Amino acid sequence: MKGVEKYEALLTEQTRNLGSDHPDTLTTKSNLADEYRDAGNLEKALEAYEAVLTDRARVLGPDHPDTLTTRNKIAYTYSIAGNPLKAIDMYEAILTDRIRVLGPDHPDTLSSRSNLAEAYSDAGKFQESIDMYETVLPDLTRILGPDHPRTLAARGNLAYAYNTWGSPQEAIGMFETLLADTVRSLGPDHRHTLATRGNLATAYMDAGKLEEAIDTLETLLSDMARTCGPDHPNTFATRSNLATAYDQAEKLEEAIGIYEALLADQNPVLGPKHPDTFTTRGKLANAYAEAEDPQKAIEINEALLNDEMSILGPDHPDTLATQSNLAIAHYIAEDLPEAIEMSEALLADQTRVLGPDHPDTLVTRGNLAAAYAKAGNLHKAIVMNEALLADQTRILGPDHGYTLSTRNNLAYTHLEAGDSRKAVKMYTDLLADHTRILGRDHPKTRAISAELTYLKNEKWRRENRK
């Protein structure tokens, strides 16, 4: 909180010597709000920004660039506070005003377009995000130049959107090209270069290239600690991503060890109630669940959920995500009535808060179907998965990872229901699509191939026993 204390003292001095309406005083008020935001105190940040906005609109006018910038910061804070839909409304209004006041080619106007694209991505509107980035990139290149940090950042965000949309192979190519350009134009230690390396590692993970992801993150972690310091939030984030890579590689003991060490470091540096600390607690709980210790996962998630309810509120996406993880832990513990009850309540909340088409809402529908299947209600699970598959195909597209996962779950449920012929047909089609989209060496492709081989061998054995 040193930054907060510094700006609070400066604000007191400037208010006394310059007056509350002096531009320098207003700038310090804005900087203080920035510090609140960066410390994770988003409620206080929003309160401070709103006060700055009122003062700047009164003193400088509603169309002054500083007033517009304050509105932009408020929208950004709403986005990271888990309210991207409100951020989208604000960004759209700011964009209209910046075009009118500053012109379409002003750097701030271009930033508004990029911010809007990012908010679309946060809201699960990936196609809108990609479309926006692809239209703003040529303008950024024309006006600011291809090597400007904002142009490079927009390229990174576009690649990130492709990866989130379910095209990790395409994202990898984009990130690798971008990395070469950022190293050349900004240098190997620039924050954009380091961020690109981290995003490339994430794309490697999503593409099933886990060894490449681990190697990239281990090297990046060393460079982050050297350039940013061991206690910098970006260094912490890299440690978290490295643990996630170990988790996905089924090296759960290593993942849990990294998460626990990270949590011990985040608590004194960021504070136990910081959003990043919450994220680590959630990831640690998930790792315990995957390590077949669901009771430990339940214990961690219940404590985390209580803290998120009080700090973030019941409707924050992170709070909803923890409810989802808690339901999954109950599912793994085979406490199916509790898992079903929690998932149904969560689905109602996500539909209300995020909307029925948000990816997180769709994931909960899939988890609920899986719980019904495990509880023996296979017909209900099949009906739910078929409806979910239709919606995912419409919203996310047929090649998205979530859509493919639902097809896999549907095939398995048909198999459990005794319809092996239909299951084999679905697995055969799914294997072809996984091979085309993810490649034959992706872990999910290999898993489907192994399942299909097993089913065909079982069919051959049954036929030869007749």
Q: Predicted segment positions?
A:
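Intrinsic-disorder-linked linear interaction elements in eukaryotic regulatory proteins
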Residues: M1-K466
